[in-house]
């Protein structure tokens, strides 16, 4: 039986980083197992491909949740990357660290070393502005104030090639963005023409692009590492289970090229299969709620009821507006517009195809007495209607000039779960978001809708409307706002927390070093270990977490 020092399950945002860092010095043999294919595909590399990949089963797990009681029986669609780079290869490219308090809360929950003072230097080590641009705004700073550039100074050496390009695309964003800035200014919302990478403020979003192409975790970290002789990558390889001996994880069984293969790990097995895949694989391997596993005929390796619990996600809503001037609808909604944008992109790697449709937004406080931002805004110069289950026709915008203002609560309180229903690894697990189960989330929805109402009443917004708002919040009482939120609200695709980090195995799956409680040789490194969801998009903190985990793993290796 072949052996590796480290076996990494999942080649996504975290797994790509681990494959790079653990193989970098040549001392360790590393295997990366990815269920999906290579990411070397046009629609994966082109930023606008986000809309094409939203329902592409070749690179997308396309999970469906169970009917949600608080959503009137609606189920929620969960796209997740099934390709090298994982969800960083199919997401909307927005890069945001969140808020310092998110990580301080991690530390306060019994996880020393995970406070913002500790992790900010990790972020600095891999973020790289591309091309060299104005420094980005940080918490507590005013627009135009000088800031630290991300640390990545050795431009000529091999290490410098292993960085994440975090790009200010404001020059390429649709000119409708000036209207969004005016709306925020009139509503007294902190805003800047310089993008924020953390904390409070509205601006154009930073994006993970490089030279007009998506810079996923695979592009940034895995591609440079794949030339190394001590790194093996298996794509289209579906993990079935992890095997244990004497309380230690020792091997991985996976299906590859039509046959089951078993490979052993001399040092560690690292689960990086994401907030859905990681608890699924643990449960299939006999680690989870013992009674539930026995009912499925599975041998219980360790009774760990916390596996698959504590599912957290951002849940939001969009408000659509008809505009009296051109938006991206006019580009993507006509053949001349699409052809012109396509030709420009092919020739120059610029224009609307070179960036996300999520172009503007940020974190805001919906009440001035709050100590931190509680709401994330999205202000998109494009509008589209969603289906009842949340699926979107992103490449077929509404047949009129339109735009969107949407929001989600930064730190929702409802907790869901991910549990297997079959011993067959090919059967998707049961995903229960449990959205809006907590009263806080309903209160947040009303408060944030009233905040958007303030934006609706700004003269700058009224000046660009072709007709009254499609959702006239001023005419809706709180009950109507909540009914609308239940009817149309949807995930923002930031699932996390299903194998949370913490000191007590009764409610946590891994310790602060990301080692699975009670089992040797097994760590979890992905968004499933988040003790609490971060305030913004989760790709940035997941990549940070993987860098910090690699430091821990290598330190233990000596």
Could you describe each region identified by the protein language model?
Residues 8, 12-17, 171-172, 275-276, ...:
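Residue-level detector of alpha-helix initiation sites
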Residues 533-551:
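A conserved FAD-binding loop/helix module that cradles the flavin
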């Amino acid at each position: 039986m072949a052996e590796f020092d480290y076996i990494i399950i999942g080649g996504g945002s975290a797994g790509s980083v681990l494959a790079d860092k653990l193989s970098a010095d040549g001392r360790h043999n590393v295997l990366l197992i990815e269920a999906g294919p290579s990411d070397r595909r046009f629609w994966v590399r082109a930023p606008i491909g986000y809309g094409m990949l939203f329902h592409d089963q070749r690179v997308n797990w396309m999970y469906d949740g169970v009917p949600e009681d608080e959503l009137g029986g609606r189920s929620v669609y969960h796209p997740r990357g099934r390709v090298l780079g994982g969800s960083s290869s199919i997401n909307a490219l927005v890069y945001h660290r969140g808020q310092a308090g998110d990580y301080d809360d991690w530390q306060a929950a019994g996880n020393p070393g995970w406070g913002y003072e500790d992790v900010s230097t990790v972020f600095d080590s891999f973020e790289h502005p591309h091309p060299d641009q104005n420094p980005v705004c940080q918490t507590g700073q005013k627009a135009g104030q000088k800031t630290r550039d991300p640390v990545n100074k050795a431009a000529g050496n091999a290490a410098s090639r292993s960085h994440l390009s975090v790009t200010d695309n404001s020059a390429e964003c649709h000119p409708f963005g000036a209207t969004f800035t005016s709306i925020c200014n009139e509503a007294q919302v902190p805003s800047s023409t310089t993008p924020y990478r953390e904390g409070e403020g509205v601006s154009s979003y930073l994006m993970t692009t490089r030279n007009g192409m998506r810079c996923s975790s695979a592009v940034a970290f895995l591609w440079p590492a794949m030339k190394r002789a001590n790194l093996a990558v298996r794509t289209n390889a579906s993990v079935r289970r992890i095997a244990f001996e004497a309380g230690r994880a020792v091997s991985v069984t996976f299906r590859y090229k039509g046959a089951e293969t078993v490979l052993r790990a001399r040092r560690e097995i690292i689960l990086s299969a994401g907030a859905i895949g990681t608890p699924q694989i643990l449960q299939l391997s006999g680690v989870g709620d013992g009674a539930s596993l026995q009912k499925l005929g599975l041998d219980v390796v360790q009774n760990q009821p916390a596996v698959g619990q504590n599912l957290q996600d951002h849940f939001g809503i969009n408000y659509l507006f008809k505009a009296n001037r051109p938006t991206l609808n006019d580009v993507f909604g006509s053949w001349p517009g699409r052809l012109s944008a396509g030709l420009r992109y092919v020739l120059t790697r610029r224009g609307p195809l070179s960036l996300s449709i999520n172009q503007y937004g940020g974190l805001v406080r919906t009440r001035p007495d709050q100590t931190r931002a509680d709401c994330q805004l999205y202000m998109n110069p494009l509008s589209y209607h969603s289906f009842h289950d949340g699926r979107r026709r992103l490449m077929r915008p509404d047949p009129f000039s339109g735009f969107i203002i949407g929001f989600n609560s930064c730190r929702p309180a409802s907790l869901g779960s991910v549990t297997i229903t079959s011993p067959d690894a090919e059967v998707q697990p049961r995903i229960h978001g449990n959205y809006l189960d907590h009263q806080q989330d309903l209160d947040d929805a009303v408060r944030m809708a009233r905040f958007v109402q303030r934006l609706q009443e700004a003269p700058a917004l009224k000046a660009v409307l072709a007709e009254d708002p499609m959702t006239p919040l001023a005419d809706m009482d709180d009950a109507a706002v909540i009914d609308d939120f239940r009817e149309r609200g949807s995930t923002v695709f930031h699932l996390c927390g299903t194998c949370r980090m913490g000191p007590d195995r009764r409610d946590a799956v891994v310790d602060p070093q990301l080692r699975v409680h009670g089992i040797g040789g097994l760590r979890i490194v992905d968004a499933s270990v988040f003790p609490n969801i971060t305030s913004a998009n989760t790709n940035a903190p997941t990549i940070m977490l993987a860098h910090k985990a690699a430091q821990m793993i290598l330190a233990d290796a000596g």
